[in-house]
Amino acid sequence: MMTKHAKPSGELSMHGFLQRSHNKTKAVVHLHPTYCTAAMYRGWQLCDIVKDFPEVFRYTKVGPNVPKLEATSHELAQATFDAMTYADTSKIIYDIVGQECHGVTAIAANPWDAFEHIERVEHICKIVLAAS
């Protein structure tokens, strides 16, 4: 139940960009998973990390990391949208992108599938960080 004092997420514009651009998108999930964020802090591209793990790349398309930008900013929203889409189009081609020093954003038909994309990448980041 929402109260009259409820405020939308500061990341509302990021969610809006992604929802408007993809007819199949029903859920945009933005989280701050520890291991994904740590891997990006080490300078790693999430899309490169998952290449060695077929259980991820078979089911989850990971795009390039978004550079460090201010949280809740229009710049972060636009950069996230750009990272998830195909070269100057609004066609979304990735399921998830990392946002350096911030978190990740995933899209899917429902929140559970979007969360599963995040969970897969988080699991691999934990493995890679433990092995390094």
Q: Would you name each region that the model predicts?
A:
Residues 1-132:
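Glycine-rich flexible loops
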